[in-house]
Swiss-Prot record:
Belongs to the ABC transporter superfamily. This is Metal-staphylopine import system ATP-binding protein CntF. It is found in: Cell membrane. SMART domains: AAA. The complex is composed of two ATP-binding proteins (CntD and CntF), two transmembrane proteins (CntB and CntC) and a solute-binding protein (CntA). The lineage of its organism: Bacteria, Bacillati, Bacillota, Bacilli, Bacillales. One of its GO terms (molecular function) is ATP hydrolysis activity. It comes from Staphylococcus aureus (strain Mu50 / ATCC 700699). Part of the ABC transporter complex CntABCDF (Opp1) involved in the uptake of metal in complex with the metallophore staphylopine (StP). May be involved in the import of a large array of divalent metals ions such as nickel, cobalt, zinc, copper and iron. Probably responsible for energy coupling to the transport system. The gene is cntF.
């Protein structure tokens, strides 16, 4: 289980004369058990990405903790084979001077250190699993469409056989039709690989399509946590505002 407990994070102001800290994430707590698919929904600037970095162990909270099976997530040996990640900006998350083969091999070497012949077969299988042929093995990221690049990023994330994958606005830069294809792929992988997801997004429609639990995030705090099936019954003012902006029931 991933457990986020009373997490807080602030950053130093860059202003020369006002060296105070600005709180970004404020006392956030929630749990993501095995088998869960949880969306964290919030508008731009709400602190979602800061929270995602703490969940991934990239940053440590100023206060509180993030644990995986009661062990601190910021320790690499805890998270190394347990959680994968897919980000919005595939152009920076995929090394521009590596082929798809090299991108996948790099992760495989860190995890298993298999012979190249074995890794070649595994990489082709991974690509097929995300809907790409082995012809993509020798392509560079700049030769891929946005949807293809995100499929490679997903292949890299599942390469370590994780129990969890965190998606940080992973489909927001894609066309609507491609978004649906990627969401369908994530549903398929969740079922076949028994994955758990933390899906960070501003898009309620995508969140309700994929996830069974929704966390509504506003100004660094959890405004509401609600099952997807009960979203249309929410009486929270901010949740209703987001629904009215994005959905019609």
């Amino acid at each position: 289980m991933i457990k986020v407990t009373d997490v807080e994070k602030s950053y130093q102001s860059a202003h020369v004369f006002k060296r105070r800290r600005t709180p970004i994430v404020k006392g956030v707590s929630f749990e993501c058990p095995i088998g869960a698919t949880i969306a964290i929904i919030g508008e731009s600037g709400s602190g979602k990405s800061t929270l995602s970095r703490m969940i991934l162990g990239i940053e440590k909270p100023d206060k509180g903790c993030v644990t995986l099976n009661d062990l601190p997530m910021h320790k690499k040996k805890v998270r190394r084979h347990q959680i994968g990640a897919v980000f919005q900006d595939y152009t920076s998350s995929l090394h521009p001077f590596q082929t798809v083969r090299e991108i996948l091999f790099e992760v495989m070497c860190q995890c298993d250190g298999q012979p190249k012949e074995v890794m070649e077969v595994q990489a082709i299988t991974l690509l097929e699993e995300v809907g790409l042929s082995k012809a993509y093995m020798d392509k560079y990221p700049n030769m891929l469409s946005g949807g293809e690049a995100q499929r490679v990023a997903i292949a890299r994330a599942i390469c370590i056989n994780p129990k969890y994958i965190l998606f940080d606005e992973a489909i927001s830069s894609l066309d609507m039709s491609i978004q649906t294809q990627i969401l369908d792929l994530l549903i398929h992988l969740r079922e076949t690989r028994q994955l758990s997801y933390i899906f960070i997004t501003h898009d309620i429609q995508a969140a309700t399509y994929l996830c069974d639990q929704l966390i509504i995030f506003k100004n660094g705090k959890i405004e509401e946590q609600i099952p997807t099936s009960a979203l249309h019954k929410s009486d929270n003012a901010y949740t209703r505002e987001l629904i009215e902006k994005q959905l019609s029931f």
